[in-house]
Amino acid sequence: MSILIGYIILLACAFGLAAGLFFGLSLIKLI
């Protein structure tokens, strides 16, 4: 059960990182 929670947290972190990178690139293009 704890392994599943850890996997979900890891997935959320990866998704957050990808979203942050995409937002950063969009912001650079906007400027």
UniProtKB/Swiss-Prot annotation:
<keyword id="KW-0793">Thylakoid</keyword>
<keyword id="KW-0813">Transport</keyword>
<dbReference type="Pfam" id="PF05115">
    <property type="entry name" value="PetL"/>
</dbReference>
<dbReference type="GO" id="GO:0009535">
    <property type="term" value="C:chloroplast thylakoid membrane"/>
</dbReference>
<dbReference type="GO" id="GO:0009512">
    <property type="term" value="C:cytochrome b6f complex"/>
</dbReference>
<feature type="transmembrane region" description="Helical">
    <location>
        <begin position="3"/>
        <end position="23"/>
    </location>
</feature>
<keyword id="KW-0472">Membrane</keyword>
<comment type="similarity">
    <text>Belongs to the PetL family.</text>
</comment>
<dbReference type="GO" id="GO:0015979">
    <property type="term" value="P:photosynthesis"/>
</dbReference>
<keyword id="KW-0150">Chloroplast</keyword>
<keyword id="KW-0812">Transmembrane</keyword>
<keyword id="KW-0934">Plastid</keyword>
<keyword id="KW-0602">Photosynthesis</keyword>
<comment type="function">
    <text>Component of the cytochrome b6-f complex, which mediates electron transfer between photosystem II (PSII) and photosystem I (PSI), cyclic electron flow around PSI, and state transitions. PetL is important for photoautotrophic growth as well as for electron transfer efficiency and stability of the cytochrome b6-f complex.</text>
</comment>
<dbReference type="GO" id="GO:0045158">
    <property type="term" value="F:electron transporter, transferring electrons within cytochrome b6/f complex of photosystem II activity"/>
</dbReference>
<keyword id="KW-0249">Electron transport</keyword>
<keyword id="KW-1133">Transmembrane helix</keyword>
<protein>
    <recommendedName>
        <fullName>Cytochrome b6-f complex subunit 6</fullName>
    </recommendedName>
</protein>
<dbReference type="InterPro" id="IPR007802">
    <property type="entry name" value="Cyt_b6/f_cplx_su6"/>
</dbReference>
<comment type="subunit">
    <text>The 4 large subunits of the cytochrome b6-f complex are cytochrome b6, subunit IV (17 kDa polypeptide, PetD), cytochrome f and the Rieske protein, while the 4 small subunits are PetG, PetL, PetM and PetN. The complex functions as a dimer.</text>
</comment>
